[in-house]
């Protein structure tokens, strides 16, 4: 079992600098570099994955669109959504891509269960769902045996921008969020519970909070 998993709490940061930093981290890390997970909220932005098609961007309006190098299609990030970027040496951990996705889904399902919310994964559509509505999205890139990008959990946010796209390429896909199912929630507490679940499902022994920037 690996030892300590490091987390960086980035607060709210624009998407592109974080994306560029995770690319640098992945490109420059050595075979002994510790894994990290970055937790962040983004200002409103649509990100279009490598499989994305222009027709799934219906009416982006004043929200910027960024073409990115993760798998999947278009999604939305905004305030009140908890994003976790998993910067892992998956080769060293011994995870296949499908295994890692399943671990991420189980992490989210157990987090939601801790709030009394029943959620499921779908074998043909990565992510986590409540009664058919999507509450969490997943998208990864593997480079040199290491992962970047990650997951996005809708906690307590404005869901309207999802109606401007076909989320993850699915026309009319309903979106939901934790606040609609669990009443009053604290964002920081959701983040803490996510950290604990990630440590558990990535087979780490413990966690620590990393200091310093990502530049």
Curated annotation (Swiss-Prot):
Compartments in which it is found: Cytoplasm
Record: residues binding substrate: 70-77, 137-139, 150-152
GO biological process, one term: protein modification process
Active site: 168
Class of enzymatic activity (EC top level): transferase
Pathway in which this enzyme or protein is active: Protein modification; protein lipoylation via endogenous pathway; protein N(6)-(lipoyl)lysine from octanoyl-[acyl-carrier-protein]: step 1/2
InterPro entries: aa-tRNA-synth_II/BPL/LPL (IPR045864), BPL_LPL_catalytic (IPR004143), Octanoyltransferase (IPR000544), Octanoyltransferase_CS (IPR020605)
Entry keyword set: Acyltransferase, Cytoplasm, Transferase
Domain of life: Bacteria
A GO term, aspect molecular function: lipoyl(octanoyl) transferase activity
GO terms for cellular component: cytoplasm
NCBIfam families according to UniProt: lipB, PRK14342.1
Misc. remarks from the entry: In the reaction, the free carboxyl group of octanoic acid is attached via an amide linkage to the epsilon-amino group of a specific lysine residue of lipoyl domains of lipoate-dependent enzymes.
Protein name (Swiss-Prot/TrEMBL): Octanoyltransferase
């Amino acid at each position: 079992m690996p030892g300590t998993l490091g987390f960086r709490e980035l607060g709210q940061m624009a998407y592109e600098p974080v994306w560029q930093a995770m690319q640098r981290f992945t490109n420059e890390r050595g075979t002994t570099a510790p894994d990290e997970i970055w937790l962040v909220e983004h200002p409103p932005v649509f990100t279009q994955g490598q499989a994305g098609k222009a027709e799934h961007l219906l009416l982006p309006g004043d929200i910027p669109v960024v073409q990115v190098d993760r798998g999947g299609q278009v999604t939305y990030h905004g305030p009140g959504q908890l994003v976790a970027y998993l910067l892992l040496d998956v080769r060293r951990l011994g995870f296949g891509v499908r295994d890692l996705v399943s671990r991420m889904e189980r992490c989210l399902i157990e987090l939601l269960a801790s709030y009394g919310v029943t959620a499921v994964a779908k074998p043909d559509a990565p992510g986590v769902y409540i009664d058919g509505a999507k509450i969490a999205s997943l998208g990864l890139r593997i480079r040199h045996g290491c992962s970047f990008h990650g997951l996005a959990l809708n906690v307590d946010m404005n869901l309207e921008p999802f109606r401007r796209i076909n989320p993850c390429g699915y026309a009319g896909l309903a979106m939901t969020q934790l606040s609609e199912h669990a009443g009053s929630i604290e964002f920081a507490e959701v983040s803490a519970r996510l950290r604990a679940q990630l440590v558990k499902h990535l087979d780490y022994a413990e966690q620590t909070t990393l200091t310093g920037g990502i530049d």
